[in-house]
Amino acid sequence: MDSGGRPRQVIRKVAERYPVVLHGVSLSIGSSDPLNMDYLHRLKRLAQEVQPQWISDHLCWTGVMGVNSHDLLPVPLTEATLDHIAARVHRVQEVLDRPLILENPSTYLDFRANTLSEPDFLRALCARTGCGLLLDVNNVYVSCFNADSDPADYFDSFPWNCVVQMHLAGHTDCGTHLIDTHDQPVRPEVWALFALAWTRSKGAATLLEWDGNIPSFEDCHAELLKSKAYMKGGLSELVNRLTPDPVPLAISNPVNFMVPDVMAGAAEMKKG
């Protein structure tokens, strides 16, 4: 994040030409550990340099007692957790001097102690802190499948007025459960949810995530074209054929693609 050298030079050059956003996985907003202030101050220095449109992370915890699990672990959806995370969001926003954007995680279990639904928890968190939301449509589908619940019900109770950005990604079907792997094309069921989310969010900025088995640029571009077709409210037979099969080529760094037309508004915001 603050190593300097070529990585910093590249992000500076990108930020000079395009609107950028910063998306993290290490904030651990739900942990019982104290906030990592060194991490926050380094993040703030990076943000001051590249001037992102927003900074986002996940509604999760990644470690405890100083040990990083390197995973995005779910939090109990209770009033006590809400109080805890709201206080931490306030502190993060004070340090960063901007609203924080939080993403719904993919989940593989529910806590017996849960007293709130995830949409209700997120709505209350936004109301208390002024934070925004990053709606990961694939995570909604994965979590609802694993919990044997209906994503349509999730959408019906979701605080759409708080959505700043959306994510699309592929997942792995393990039969009895789904895993959010980001190494497959977006599934048809997720595209259908995205079409609904696009309308309800009034066209929130959208990003396609692909972290492993990364195919050719042409195949990635085809997925972007498919997303634009859904944004326009329909798909032709041709566009339906644009979803590629996974290519067995893995690289170590994720490749994330902003849908260009959706970012036009963010670019105008940056000029302003």
Ranges and model annotations:
Residues 7, 18, 26-28, 59-63, ...:
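Active-site-proximal loop/turn and secondary-structure-junction residues that shape catalytic pockets
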Residues 1-10, 16-21, 42-50, 68, ...:
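Extended recognition/assembly regions associated with phosphoester-bond processing machinery
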Residues 55, 136, 166, 206:
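Conserved, mostly hydrophobic/aromatic
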Residues 2-4, 72-76, 82, 144-201:
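Gly/Pro-rich active-site loop or hairpin
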Residues 36-133:
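Active-site acidic/histidine proton-transfer and metal-coordination neighborhood
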